[in-house]
Amino acid sequence: MQADKSEQRAVTRLCIQCALYLLQHGAESALVEELSTRLGRALGMDSVESAISSNAIVLTTIKDGECLTSTRKNSDRGINMHVVTEVQHIVIMAEHKLLDYKDVEKRFSQIKPLRYPRWLLVLMVGLSCACFCKLNNGGWDGAVVTFFASTVAMYIRQLLTHRSMHPQINFCITAFVATTISGLMLRLPAFSETPTIAMAASVLLLVPGFPLINAVADMFKGHINTGLARWAIASLLTLATCIGVVMAMTMWGLRGWA
């Protein structure tokens, strides 16, 4: 009996760790609930119930009429689909009886978020913003302006993130830098005829697309509270970006977007 309780306690910890990994790294709430439940049942539980909010998870496992509940506080670790994929693989292996709870615990301890080199991330963000500008009739000169502005802005954003700057302040400063660089470059004689779409494209790196998509997905699938919380966070980030853009345009007297 004591051994069964000890095993249930271990499985409960693994289930809530599974849910926490997913929620911390950007998975939608329905996936968090589904995978934690599947893992618990794969490891011998009769039922797994969970309540998910934006800053905490409460999870209960039931086996032979015995309930065990655990609570964990959630902290955002940034979007990382590598972690989500790794957790999915572990759950699938447990369902196929390739892993017991001790193996799952070992696999969880080995999960490390995939991090790309900073220089590569800066380069790819600059190129993606420049391509958007070119596709929206910004021309090659507009793409050059966008590339330089968004590259520097992404570098600044990484520096501020590394120093644990508040996300809203981070986005505001980054938007200010991107708009300042692109706007002042458009004043140069070489770019005097460049469309101002370059200014808009240079702040695309700050669009919180993933949180907004997850917010809508959560609300459609019944996780209203989590969806609204994610929507509010994404809206605040968007507001901070707008403030940074307006500050730069007002300070330097830049012409508006067209």
From Swiss-Prot:
GO terms for molecular function: transmembrane transporter activity. One of its GO terms (cellular component) is plasma membrane. Keywords: Cell inner membrane, Cell membrane, Membrane, Transmembrane, Transmembrane helix, Transport. This is Probable succinate transporter subunit YjjP. It is found in: Cell inner membrane. GO terms for biological process: succinate transport. The keyword Transport applies. The transporter is composed of YjjB and YjjP. The chain crosses the membrane at residues 116-137, 143-160, 171-191, 197-217, 231-251. The gene is yjjP. YjjPB constitutes a split-type ThrE family transporter. It is a multi-pass membrane protein. Involved in succinate export with YjjB. Both proteins are required for export. Participates in succinate export, but also in the export of other dicarboxylates, such as fumarate and malate. Contributes to succinate production under both aerobic and anaerobic conditions, and increases fumarate and malate production during anaerobic succinate production. Belongs to the ThrE exporter (TC 2.A.79) family. Its main location: membrane.
